Every structure is written in C-alpha cells, then in structure tokens.
From Swiss-Prot:
It catalyses: sulfate + ATP + H(+) = adenosine 5'-phosphosulfate + diphosphate. Its EC number is 2.7.7.4. GTP binds at residues 31-38, 110-114, 165-168. Heterodimer composed of CysD, the smaller subunit, and CysN. This is Sulfate adenylyltransferase subunit 1. Belongs to the TRAFAC class translation factor GTPase superfamily. Classic translation factor GTPase family. CysN/NodQ subfamily. Residues 110-113 are annotated as: G3. It comes from Francisella tularensis subsp. tularensis (strain WY96-3418).
Length: 470
C-alpha cells in the first residue's frame, strides 16, 4: 500500500503516534441516486493513495465485468461491496471507509440515494459532523437532495459542502453551476445549516477533488479535500456532564459502582452530582476505569463511579452535576424519521429507547409532517415509510433527556416495534411538554437532610421547622 508518509517505512511507531494524535472528522456523502457518491469516495481513497495493490488489481478486473465506465476504472466499486450493489450499480447499505491525510483522520459514510433506502441514510448521518451533498450538474436538485438536506438539518449537522458533480458532462459550465448554487441557497433558507460551501467537481476525472482543476478557472474557491482538512468543527455541543447508567456493578457486599460511558462533559472525584429522574444528590467517591483509578474523566470514557451515599441508582438513570439538570418528563415533542413499512399511527404502543432507558410510549398527537419538495407543514394522521413529522409522544413513565439541539446524544431516541423488535423510527427531542418537567423542590436536599427534617418535625414540633418536602 502506498502512502504519502515516508514514516511507514522508516519509523512505524512514530507514524502510528502521529496518526493517533490527528483530529478525527466523520462525514457523510449523500444526494440523489446516481449523483456519484460512491465514485467520489473511491476518488478520495484513490488520490489519497490509501488503496492496497491487490485492491486496485481487483477493481481493475471488476471494472471490466460489472463496471459502468466502459474501459475506464470504476472507482465506485471500491465502496459498493455488496454483490447486489455491484450488479445494480447502486448503493444499498451504508458503507463506512477510513482514510487519513497529513492533517486529519476521516471516517466516511457513503449512503444510498434511492428513496426506499432513506432510513439507511438517516442512520449514517446520525453520528456525522459534516455532510457532502452531491448534485448531478445535468439534473440539478432532486427530491432526494431536498430530503437528505432536511434530514441533515434535523440531525444537527452544522457543516455542509454542496459538491456539484459531473461538471465534465456539461462542459464545465459556470452558468449551470451558478444556477444550482442559487437554487440550493433558496432551499437552505428553510433549513438550520449555518455553514454551507460549494465546489464544482468531477469525481470520475478528479477535478477539484484533491487538487484544483485547471478546467474551471472561473472557480475561485478551494478543492474539496482542502475544505475537509481545514473546516473547523465544534465538537462540544454541551459541556454539561451526562452519564447514563448502563449497569450497577456489585461484585461483593463491599463494593457498589455504577458503570457507563460519559456522553458529554466531565466529572472528577469530589463533584456533587444529582441522579435523574429521582433528583437525589450525592458526591463522587471514586472513578474507576480499565486503566485503574482516575481523578477525572471526560466524554467518551467508559468508567465506574462510586458514591459516598447509599442512594437508589439503577440502569437507565442519568447522573448529572447538581446544578446542570436535564429535563424529566413523560410527554415530549419530537421530530420523527419513520423507517418502517408499517405506518406510525396514534395511540399504538411502541418501545421507546433513550440510551440505556427503555419505556413504552405512543403518539399522542401528530402536529404535522413535512412536505419534502416544499418544506411546508402538512396535516397528517399517520406516518409512512421515509416520511418526516413532528409529533407529541406520551411515555409510560418520566424519563430524563435534553433537547436534541443541545445534546445530540441525550436528545435522541429510537422507536422499536414491540412485536418484531425492529427499529421503526428515529426521534430527535424538541422540548418536554408535561408539567413534571418542573424542578422538584426536594432536589436541593440530600436524602439524609430530608429524613432528618422529618424526624425534627415529628419529635420537636415546637421548633416550627419547615417541611422540606413541600
């Protein structure tokens, strides 16, 4: 395998150390069918010199058998790995590929363009920081272009690069490129995507992909790879500590710890924490990890927390800092991307899964669904496959969560069919609706303080002590 870095041959340990320290960017390629998404991914891998020699030989052979580019190398075959994908010349599953340059590491999610695979696209986009939306210069904006752009906006992707592909087929026309740019900016006015950039490319020929193309001297911007390497991503959606409890660890009578992965923020020994939804307050006694005891832990780390107080903490609870509480409610408003062939209907019970917490819930009300072509709100009573709607959800018990705009992890949930156990939908919380979202007045006191207050009021009524539970 050839690579730009000479360290692989001279000092492999130093190369691996440098690679580990590089910033990671997760991005998705999306757009309508046959816009060239897989070809673009293949071009990025090929021009970054991250293809093994046997891979290249295999692609050369496959290009002659099932390729769609005549005698030329079909780079899309690098990522269209399923036999059905190669035979049909389309992408069906979400394909993940990994590569790096001198400046960054990348994980690419290549998603399907066909309408029936929109659910796969939503899955691929859920963990991405940036989206490349491809538009065929010959066709302009399609329904799937609008659908994918809207889903990217819903999923909180703040950075979008619009790549106008196949410029070679329209004679590298600046007028066509400008027309598509204006049309997309008009669409973007209805979306919440603050950073949008445009680049005209030919993924097949490599124009403006890794290096600037002399065939489009009128384009004053940078090639696609330059944007990917330099665009600044704000990874910290929130600094508030969120620790969903996955498991209560009790190997013996002397130890009781709470295990899980920190999804945002950080915590250290001695921090005052609150357990949601109960609101009980305690202090962190120790933080344990695979590498031993830690003084502090941050987002992404899997740890075990022990506390000074013996309070009730169970799987599905959320541990937060005392004064940075999450919402607690049994009713909420959310955006839904429906992924099941069976329609979503009112009052039908589903499993609703928030991280480690699973409850039963149903749609209490359809607010509206979104017309993908116009982005207008349309009244509805059901939701079909690949449709997107805003709903009010009623849960069997209060759960803790944040809005999706604030925290993409604690503000997300999935809907599971109770009969088939199939994931039927993906949800993004807008806000809580129930009155029990209000902060409980007892949350300011520990269990010991509440019990002591009750004893004082019982045995010393003449002290006129205030009831802390009221």
């Amino acid at each position: 395998m050839s690579h730009k870095s000479d360290l692989i041959a001279t000092n492999i340990q130093k190369y691996l150390q440098q690679r580990q320290q590089k910033e990671l960017l997760r991005f998705i390629t999306c757009g309508s069918v046959d816009d060239g998404k897989s070809t673009l991914m293949g071009r990025l891998l090929h021009d970054s010199k991250l293809i093994f020699e046997d891979q290249l030989a295999s692609i050369v052979a496959d290009s002659k058998k099932v390729g769609t580019q005549g005698d030329r190398l079909d780079l899309a075959l690098l990522v269209d790995g399923l036999q059905s994908e190669r035979e049909q010349g389309i992408t069906i599953d979400v394909a993940y590929r990994y590569f790096s340059t001198d400046k960054r590491k990348f994980i690419i999610a290549d998603t399907p363009g066909h309408e029936q695979y929109t659910r796969n696209m939503a899955t691929g986009a859920s963990n991405c920081d940036l989206a490349i939306i491809l538009i065929d210069a010959r066709k302009g904006l399609q329904t799937q272009t609008r659908r994918h752009s809207f889903i990217c906006s819903l999923l909180g992707i703040k950075h979008v690069i619009v790549a106008v592909n196949k410029m070679d087929t329209v004679g590298y026309s600046q007028q066509i490129y400008k027309s598509i740019q204006d049309e997309y900016l008009k669409l973007a006015g209805s979306l919440q995507i603050p950073d949008i950039r445009f680049v005209p490319i030919s993924a097949l020929d490599g124009d403006n992909v890794v290096s600037k193309s002399p065939k489009m001297p009128w384009f004053r911007g940078s090639p696609l790879m330059h944007y990917l390497e330099t665009i600044k991503i704000d990874y910290a959606y929130t600094d508030e500590f969120r620790f969903p409890v996955q498991l209560v660890c009790r190997p013996n009578s002397e130890f009781r710890g709470f295990q899980g992965t920190i999804v945002s923020g950080s915590a250290k020994i001695g921090d005052t924490i609150r357990v949601m939804p109960s609101g009980k307050i305690t202090t962190i006694k120790s933080i344990l990890s695979f590498d031993g005891e830690l003084n502090e832990a941050e987002a992404g780390q899997s740890i075990t927390i022990t506390t000074y107080d013996e309070i009730d903490i169970s799987r599905g609870d959320m541990i937060v800092h005392k004064d940075a509480i999450s919402h607690v409610s049994s009713m909420l408003r959310a955006n839904i991307v429906w992924m099941s062939e069976q329609p979503l209907i009112e009052y039908k019970d589903y499993y609703i899964k928030f991280l480690t917490k699973q409850v039963i819930g149903s749609v209490n009300k359809f607010n509206y669904k979104t017309d993908i072509n116009t982005l207008k709100e349309v009244a509805c009573g059901t939701l079909e496959l690949n449709e997107i709607a805003t709903i009010e959800l009623k849960l069997s018990e209060p759960v803790c969560f944040d809005s999706y705009q604030k925290n993409r992890t604690t503000g997300a949930f999935i809907i599971i069919d109770r009969l088939t156990n199939v994931t039927a939908g993906a949800g993004m919380v807008i806000k809580p609706l129930a009155a029990n979202d209000k902060k409980d007045s007892t949350n300011d006191y520990s269990e010991f303080e509440l019990e002591l207050n009750a004893l004082i009021r019982k045995h010393f009524p003449h002290w006129d002590a205030k009831n802390l539970r009221e």
